[in-house]
Amino acid sequence: MKMFSDPMVRVRALLIFFMIGLALSGLSAVPLQWELDILKPLFGSGSQFSRFFPAISSWIDQVYQGVKNGYGLYPFLAYGTDWLAFGHIAIALAFIGPVREPIKNLWVVEFGMIICVLVIPWTLVFGPLRGIPFFHMLLDMSFGMVGIIPLWLARRSILDLIS
């Protein structure tokens, strides 16, 4: 597209895309119980899905029970996922600087890229400590692997603006 041939437009589009994805990813942590109420019948034990992926279905059942019982007995546990969402939104807002002045705020983009890379060792260390199955850890790591792509492309375009 002609519009994205301008490096400044490309940088802004990539960063806004990243910011929206980051914010939506975080916001999905708030209605966790509601989301699991929808997922369990579709993908939990007894669903058609469970015939092909029984381990994932069993995990969905376990997470559903954990959230339902945990939030039921200790509703303050949900406060942790509320803060997780807040953290995602706060980090997304930090990218307003690079959207406005990409060259001056290149460091924010590079910081975001570092965080995307750090998702992988963080997951590999803490996932097993918390009993998280490997397939779920792959999902968690994918956020860093996917998130780094628009940031890397934005960084390349910012460097084009500098030169």
Model-identified regions with their sequence ranges:
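Individual transmembrane alpha-helix segments
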Residues: 64-92
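Short, amphipathic, aromatic/basic-enriched membrane-interface segments that mark the entry/exit
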Residues: 77-82, 105-111
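N-terminal signal-anchor transmembrane alpha helix
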Residues: 9-50
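N-terminal membrane topogenic signal
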Residues: 3-16, 157-160
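Alpha-helical transmembrane segments of multi-pass integral membrane proteins
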Residues: 109-163
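Juxtamembrane helix-break-helix junctions at the cytosolic face
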Residues: 90-106
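Membrane-interface interhelical connector segments
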Residues: 39-70
